[in-house]
């Protein structure tokens, strides 16, 4: 409990390198991780600041991303590394490059040993939860889309121009939107 709200944390203990443990145990670990991610509202992906983003971190991030979860990248042991005025910027740049498919993920730098910034984690969890369940009115979405189209015209193919009619939000967790167009073949998946 924190400030009268209840939070349940599930520690998967991460995935292991195959050369460190047997494949059967690795398979079980993956199943546990996937199950924990599916149960979660927000995934706290803990990265060791002394190691950076590992292959296992990227796997867990991919699982959470594919399941549309809110994600907070928690960089632990921030107190254990040498820092200068560019350290945080460089670390974030590395995270964003490695996990480029999830630019929406929040990043937080903490120290479990000293307690540095741990209390702020609850505020971040609440904010991510709120963003995951946010509903945006169709009128507001259409205004944003109209402004975007005014700044950057949609592409055309062989003289046929993509027309965006309107956009609406169809679900939350994760927020999902549908855009109605004249020809879906002209619309890029991203």
Go through each PLM region and give its residues.
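C-terminal-of-GTPase-core extension/linker across diverse P-loop GTPases
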Residues: 1-10, 14, 18-31, 35, ...
């Amino acid at each position: 409990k924190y400030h009268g709200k209840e939070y349940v944390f599930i520690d998967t203990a991460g995935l292991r390198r195959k050369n460190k443990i047997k494949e059967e145990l690795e398979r079980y670990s993956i199943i546990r991780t996937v199950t924990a991610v599916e149960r979660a509202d927000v995934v706290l992906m803990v990265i060791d600041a002394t190691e950076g983003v590992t292959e296992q971190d990227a796997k867990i991030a991919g699982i959470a991303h594919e399941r549309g979860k809110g994600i907070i990248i928690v960089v632990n042991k921030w107190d254990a590394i040498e820092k200068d005025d560019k350290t945080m910027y460089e670390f974030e740049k590395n995270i964003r490059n490695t996990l480029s498919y999830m630019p929406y993920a929040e990043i937080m730098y903490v120290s479990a040993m000293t307690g540095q910034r741990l209390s702020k984690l609850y505020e971040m969890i609440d904010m991510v939860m709120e963003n995951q369940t946010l509903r945006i009115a169709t009128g507001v979405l259409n205004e944003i889309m109209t402004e975007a189209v005014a700044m950057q015209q949609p592409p055309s193919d062989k003289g046929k121009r993509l027309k965006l009619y309107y956009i609406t939000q169809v679900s939350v967790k994760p927020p999902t939107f549908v855009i109605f167009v004249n020809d879906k073949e002209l619309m890029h998946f991203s």
